Amino acid sequence: MATTPDAAFEALMNGVTSWNLPKEPTPSELLLTGEAAFPVMVNDKDQVLIAASFYGHGRLVVLSHESYLLHAGLAPFLLNAVSWLCPSPEAPIAVHSSLASLVKILGDSGVNAVVQPEPREALGVYCIDAYSETLTETLIRFMKNGGGLLIGGQALTWAVHHGHEKVLSSFPGNQVTSVAGVYFTDISGNRDWFKVSKEIPNLTLYVQCEDELKYDQQQLLKGMSEMDIETGPVPSQLLVHGQRAFPLGVDNSFNCFLAAARFGRGRVVLAGHESLILNQTMLPFVLNALRWLMGNQTGRIGLASEMKALKSVLPNSSFEWSETELLTNDLSVFCSCSLGKTDPKKVEEFVAEGGGLLIGAEAWMWGRRNPDSNCMTQYPNNIILKRFGVGIISQVVQRGRFPVPNPEVINYHIRRALSQYESVIHSQGSSLQEGWLNKLSQDCFYMFQMTHQRISIYDSVKEHALKMIQSQGFPSVTEQHPITKGSSQAFLLSLAYELFKSGVDRSQLLPPPTLLSPTESPMTIKISTGNDNSWVSTGLYLPEGQVAQVTLPTEATHAKLKVLIGCHIDNISQAKTYIRPPVMTYVYHLTSSQTSISWLYGGLLYIMVPDKYNQDNVSVTISGAVSAPYFRLGKTTQEEWKNLIEHSKAPWGELATDNIILTIPTVNLKVLQDPYPLLQLWDKIVKAVAKLAARPFPFQRPERIVLDKQISFGFLHSGYPIMGLIIIVEGIINEFKIRSHGVWGVTHELGHNHQKPGWTFRPHTTEALCNLWSIYVHETVLNIPRDQAHPSLNPELRKQRIKDHLNKGAPLSNWIVWTALETYLQLQEGFGWEPFIQLFANYQTLTGLPQNNEDKMNLWVKKFSEVVQKNLAPFFKAWGWPVQHAVAKSLASLPEWQENPMKMYTAESTEHTE
């Protein structure tokens, strides 16, 4: 039997070559919301007119008008439907009296059927129209127990008499089919042309049908004007993605933290943290929520252990409580923080058949602990919640007090927003509300996480997104064609990235690439334990759109090795304007012996080796990539380098020593005929950096400097790698310029990389102490005095800075950057560099270091005084440091620092006051 949607579709469409439908009846468009539901027939407007689904042990086929079940022209499909619905070939088939003529249509094709008023136990398939109000429970039970239900009808006439907004919740047919995620709507289906698909057709993004959700929102928010999340635990964001799901609490960036949904005949309320449910200030909402979740039911409310406090929070309510960890059929509502140990199918059926679910939980902590995991499908609560059209994601919302959503206003919803954007790019709709596109980019990331299981309601979203990219073309972003944040082009860039991450092949996103010739033979890189916690350069470049193969021994597939494509790791999404794509790198986990790799933008290839890596001499082989200019000090000959820069088509290359690696545009490398002297100088620079930091040399992991068109902030910033703008390239690869003008910016960032929390006093010395490395390198390696190394170190400016600080009363708030650096410069000029080196070494052996600035500063006063054997308490006090009495007393026995340079300034200050 066909048990997957694809196999089921194939069985239902076997031999069907056309849709011979009667022209007179007006069908209802069908809405699909369940994970098991899939479209079978759509028209030229992408409206679903026939759908199928699974429920319990049974199956369902829904036609959008009952006359289709009585039309002989549809006999081939009807026979397939009955065959697929029937659990066994021998099981009898019955038809409700309203469809009596269907018996003849089936009989003429050799299928026996009888008329019965309702389905019985031994029955295989039951056929009925969508208007019975007395058989709801019987039909659901029949399906759940393994029967097949063939049902047809339209809700248009019913809507006229009972109200369009009530169709999804109250139309008789929907009372049955909704449990399997299929609804009859009040929208007329177009009858002009019908597609015959060879595979499951695509769904529309959003069906614009009337619903009761506006009234649900009003009922849930009755008596509330705002949500206060200024204090208390910060909630996780929620993804509201189901058509019948809606927001209840939203911050200023459209991030939802409280939501609700209808699913089948039941209801769900979800909070991004349990505190939103258990908080006294939320009592009005909780009462509204419980009443709404109860609906017309009269059973008990089940409280899991973490929700027991609800009972005491609502002592005067009329609810009947039951403390239980188990979801049982006698409950009307179940309240919990965790559904991870509950059978997802059981929870789904509980809600589908009328139960209420109240859940409060956060996922941001789970996200921190599982950074490489898929939040929407692996976070335990989401395995269940996503079925109801909601999910908890690993991002947090803003703190604040936020007005409740206005039911009369169109609220942000991913499907509505994406559908509206689709209309905009096809010039069929007005522009999106400001800020929606930025929110949509994030939500697509989480939405696409659910598109790996062939589920129509999720896959269709990805298909629509892909068509948007294909219709508009892959966005190009350069200095000549910049893209503005929040623009349509920026959104398309983000959408393409999320689609690629979700598994869409690059060929569906990119125009055909201009292929570059790969290396003649595969290249093998040896990975050893000495490479742990680093990137290993391969000397290879993967052009955009091309595919390379990475192979490694089977025994290394559990070593957590990765391939990094590209080294420009700064995510510049928050920039106002982009001159290059916001995300330029992509990582593949090497969990199998052979991995195909590609990337939208290409890039240099690296093997990422994890911390505490313990497999030695592992061979990683790469084929299909191209050679990049790569010079390694002591290994690459000048002739090899000349050949590389002459013939390489790769746009980036690298200059490497054992201690530092420079990633430079190839066009700049072509003028560098002999990198040897330059790299020797860089090795001396980083050796000096290591010496001052009291770190072993050569480095276990070489420092990296990567130049880029655009970085996240500044023109240089620290990290691994140090990122810098291309405009500084001459100052990095021109040996003469380095020796004559220095290299302050890079050495400043190298200093940052060696700053340690134990002796860094944020925010005072964050941008001060790192300059010690700049000064040390300039004076000991480049022979450039400090007053020439940086204009801010002009002697007169230094003196004035000290005077200004003291004239203000030496407030600690003023002791930052150059003023703070001056304190350390006076110590260095008084005692030399050795005490710093010794102290930095000593700190590496200390444990239990203080965490607050005052204690950290006093420890530094004490340790520096001990190293130089001078009482430095008066010196630091003069600078405004909060020297504690106990520390000053402990240092009193040490000799006074007679040459204390602050004496001169404090004496001057005293004279002026006199």
Curated annotation (Swiss-Prot):
GO CC annotation, single: plasma membrane
List, alphabetically, the InterPro entries matched.
Class_I_gatase-like, M60-like_N, Pep_M60_3, Peptidase_M60_dom, TCAF
Describe the location of the Peptidase M60 domain by residue ranges: 533-832
Annotated Gene Ontology MF terms? transmembrane transporter binding
- Which Pfam families has this protein been placed in? M60-like_N, Peptidase_M60
- What does the sequence similarity comment in the record state about its family? Belongs to the TCAF family.
Q: What does this protein do?
A: May play a role in the regulation of the cation channel TRPM8 activity.
Q: What is this protein called?
A: TRPM8 channel-associated factor 3
Which organism is this entry from? Rattus norvegicus
Q: What is the lineage of its organism?
A: Eukaryota, Metazoa, Chordata, Craniata, Vertebrata
What would be the name of the gene that encodes this protein?
Tcaf3
